[in-house]
């Protein structure tokens, strides 16, 4: 077992010509630290100092599953985001909020979880949160949207878990809605390989199958490409402000704004189409994903989301 407080170990990893420096000079642009809450502050201090001494733009992101501003481990409150350690963290709280909303449609709980992180995190950390909805530690997103906690089932159940055609189509609709949130909440979207191609699976090791070269779900792939283009066209999604607008009746809405550019994101988790009546600044404006007609309201299909730009 490694003692991360050991001076020689810290020197080996973070010292001059150490492991951190080696891979940065080889072309890496930063690090994601696995299970950062199991690393002591002394190690994190020296590691992050070493990385930043080479280039202040190099990024260090830690794997923290809870709110990183009040995480308790190693016998005390951690100082990840106080300015001398991590730049940001993997955003498991947002992932949990998105998945739970997609499964159960409780809008109020979703917004409460998101607002809590937005209020607690420094703006610099908030803007570079690693927003994922699937990782090597979780069940595949398509499977997880239909089967809650599948990764905790016996392996003989997980190995045979494959969505029916009806379940798959429902999961795809929920995935598309979920990814709109993933791509528009504060932070940057991170995609676990294969999610953009329709890969299914339970927990480890069933979430680590080969990429389906030649058998990708082109509809899902094209959806991710479309969202990527929308995101890249909007500066307000890089580091704009976030404001909740509404959260009720299985529907959520929020705005992002920066330097005069403003969008409203509306997600409908209901099993039916809704008419969402808009504030004045978004009436008769442009819907960016589908080109949906916008008057003083917008029609949003079941399990779907829209992005409306005010100007």
Set out the residue ranges of the language-model regions.
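Aromatic- and acidic-residue-enriched carbohydrate-binding clefts of CAZyme catalytic domains
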Residues: 1-4, 21, 154, 158
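Aromatic/acidic polysaccharide-binding cleft in carbohydrate-active enzymes
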Residues: 75, 131-163, 179-217
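Aromatic-anchored helix/helix-loop segment that forms the rim or "lid"
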Residues: 108-111, 115-117, 149-176, 233
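Carbohydrate-interacting/catalytic domains
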Residues: 76, 171-172, 184-191, 197-311
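Active-site-proximal helices and loops of the catalytic beta/alpha 8
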Residues: 18-21, 29-129, 181, 198-226, ...
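Short beta-strand segments
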Residues: 31-34, 61-63, 131-134, 192-193, ...
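Short, acidic/polar
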Residues: 5-24, 175-179
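Short, solvent-exposed loop/turn segments at secondary-structure junctions
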Residues: 24, 29, 37-40, 65-68, ...
